[in-house]
Amino acid sequence: MIIVIMGVSGSGKTVVGSQLAKKLGWNFYDADDYHPLENKEKMSQGTPLNDQDRHPWLCELHEIMMREKALGQHVVLACSALKRAYRSTLLTGSTPHWPENYQENDDLSSDTLFVHLHGSLEILSRRLLERKGHFMPRTLLDSQIDTLEPPSAPERFIAIDVDKDISVIVSEIEGEVDRKMMLVKSAQKD
């Protein structure tokens, strides 16, 4: 199973994702670690990334998830995944195709749960202002909010408000993962 912890900057993707992975004993990847230097420089200068900037990065993340799946590993990935097209690329490794050609069995679609962390502008802004040493400045939060396409059917997702303790958020996700894993095991028995 693959869990993608998604949301705008400041939503807590890395903290939640790393704690969840540790609690579950799964591998953790932070998508920020895979941005090319050009992307990091662009963002640190306050310039939002465009679709062309993101596509190779998303394809690399897809390859990582495919490799882990082939090895039989479960993965938690912290990744903004702001647009439906970006999430499609994460799942298929190809040019976005949702909804026209959506296929339930596309590469990672049936194995992936998106966890959308969301919160008020006030909470997100405060978190970004408190964060030190990150290439993503507070000034880009508005552009990320404008870009965000919250997940919806047929995507597999849950949405969690981040205005609570991290341990509560992690427990909520863990409960959902347990339910999904039980459903998979039940389906395999049938």
Swiss-Prot record:
The keyword tRNA processing does not apply. This is Probable gluconokinase. NCBIfam families: therm_gnt_kin. Pfam families: SKI (PF01202). It comes from Xenopus tropicalis. Its EC number is 2.7.1.12. Keywords: ATP-binding, Kinase, Nucleotide-binding, Transferase. Belongs to the gluconokinase GntK/GntV family. The keyword ATP-binding applies. ATP binds at residues 7-14. Pathway: Carbohydrate acid metabolism; D-gluconate degradation. One of its GO terms (biological process) is carbohydrate metabolic process.
